[in-house]
Amino acid sequence: LPDELEGMPEYSPLVFPMMDYVIGHNIDFDADCCQIPGAVKRICTLAMARAIWPNTSHTQSALLYMLSNDRAATRERLRNAHSAGADVIFCYEILLAILSERPHIRTIEELYAFSEECRIPKVMTFGKFSGMPVQHVETGWRNWYRRQTDKDPYLLRAFELYPYDPMYKE
């Protein structure tokens, strides 16, 4: 609210040092909010977690509980779950668990490639085709989506990789 801003210091945008990669849980949200330049490669722990552990909730809290050996201690740690510092630590712990599941990933570029692969949906997450394989999304709907102004580039890539196939079986 405007009255809460009275007497506060002037806003100045964040300035990030030169970086090649940024890692986060739902990284596009963080990168867009922080105005991280588009040339920086985004690595998404949310997308990788969805690929590695498809049958669980993928919030940071749910993943930390799933990965935990001490739920009481995890519950205590999660009391600070909505601070930036805690989010960074939790994201790091999830990243370590992802890397333990994928020991062949040895470099940041391999991690980025895996993240990019995981970000391409295989199942629709919204609309009338929600929950269905991308191959079941009809051509007309695909064409409609391509005409929208706010398109997900990863869904467009999925349309390229997985053409419409009404006979497709999982």
Labelled PLM ranges:
Residues 94-170:
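Acidic two-metal-ion nuclease catalytic site recognized across multiple nuclease folds
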